[in-house]
């Protein structure tokens, strides 16, 4: 987030969205689209909370255990099925997760904003 803000990308991303553009965040990019990233153990940098971009109503807390799984997945809006790998660190929760981007091995993952 620090580098993204230092380069002015936060301003560009928000302007793109205001003009009707869509933003897709994968992995850490998804976490940065939320309100807050809490890293109490300094796993990804300085210990503490970092303000996200606020494009998704979600908050993330980082945990030291990294998850790596092969998954069977489905994109709920289109019912498109796919397979892949999930590399995951931390837990992201919030109201926008009620509109998941995907279902991985039958559980919801990711979020789609109210405005799509």
Residue ranges and their predicted role:
Residues 1-83:
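Cysteine-nucleophile active-site neighborhood
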Residues 70-116:
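C-terminal and late-domain segments of enzyme folds
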